[in-house]
């Protein structure tokens, strides 16, 4: 099986390193890493269209896996890999392991999730993998990678719709402390943001943003609630943002709107 690894934390980040090491050690997969050359978290699904992209082959210590560093976004990395860099499209794209969770409305900002969605747009099955809390030690990422590697063969036994990615959040705890696996929907996760104004040497203002996450909607079937219970959350996510519940009501506007076009 050909697997493309990517992320939004950068090609040298500990999460993607751990995932590569664990999957390479298993010897069952043909791996390629194409990832941003630097931190690209919270870049969403942006792509680069107003300048050229640069890609450089890199080598990983004690590894035979091909690596390509790209000066673009996570979505750029997947597009470039699939459409230009690889001889054959991958059978699967894995995005992560992200440093920190991607829960609820995080998925709208997440470069990790967006890379998986870009793969899905190209007809390739994809999984986004994130740590349930921010991790700082390589051992934490290796533990999460080993947990995911146990799950992957079982996941692949059950093909999922091609308009859908799987968004997986793994609690940052030892395997024996994980309480189970929950199939979840997205919760609502917002942030209380603070913008700190500073001055540059020319006296011009610039702003640093920081924020604290707030889980507004924590139904027991949400990803946020599952992670709080120390469960692995698996959420099917797709890019159709249509509000189907509101479609019929919106259709009642048509005559009035057409009337506005006909008058005056």
Swiss-Prot record:
EC number: 3.1.3.5
Subcellular locations according to the entry: Cytoplasm
Entry keyword set: Cytoplasm, Hydrolase, Metal-binding, Nucleotide-binding
Coiled-coil stretches noted in the UniProt entry, renumbered to this chain: none
Signal sequence region: none
Function statement: Nucleotidase that shows phosphatase activity on nucleoside 5'-monophosphates.
Protein name according to UniProt: 5'-nucleotidase SurE
Species annotation: Carboxydothermus hydrogenoformans (strain ATCC BAA-161 / DSM 6008 / Z-2901)
């Amino acid at each position: 099986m050909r697997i493309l690894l990517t992320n939004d934390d950068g090609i040298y980040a500990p999460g993607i390193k751990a995932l590569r090491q664990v999957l390479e050690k298993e010897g069952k997969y043909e791996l390629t890493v194409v990832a941003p050359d630097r931190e690209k978290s919270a870049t969403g699904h942006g792509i680069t269209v107003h300048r050229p992209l640069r890609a450089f082959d890199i080598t990983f210590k004690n590894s035979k896996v091909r690596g390509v560093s790209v000066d673009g976004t996570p979505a750029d990395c997947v597009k470039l890999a699939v459409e230009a860099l690889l001889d054959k499209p991958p059978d699967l794209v894995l995005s992560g392991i992200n440093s920190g969770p991607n829960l609820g409305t995080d998925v709208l900002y997440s470069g990790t999730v967006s890379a998986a969605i870009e793969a899905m747009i190209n007809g390739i099955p994809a999984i986004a993998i994130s740590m349930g809390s921010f991790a700082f030690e390589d051992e934490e990422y290796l533990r999460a990678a080993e947990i995911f590697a146990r799950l992957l063969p079982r996941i692949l036994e059950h093909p999922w719709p091609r308009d859908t990615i799987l968004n997986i959040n793994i609690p940052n705890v030892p395997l024996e402390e994980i309480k189970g696996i929950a199939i979840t929907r997205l919760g609502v996760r917002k942030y209380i943001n603070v913008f700190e104004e500073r001055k540059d040497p020319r006296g011009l203002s610039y702003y640093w943003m920081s924020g604290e996450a707030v889980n507004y909607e924590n139904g027991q079937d949400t990803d946020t609630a599952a992670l709080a219970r120390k469960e692995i959350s698996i959420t099917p996510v797709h890019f159709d943002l249509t509000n189907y519940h509101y479609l019929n009501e919106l259709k009642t506007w048509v005559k009035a709107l057409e009337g506005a076009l006909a008058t005056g």
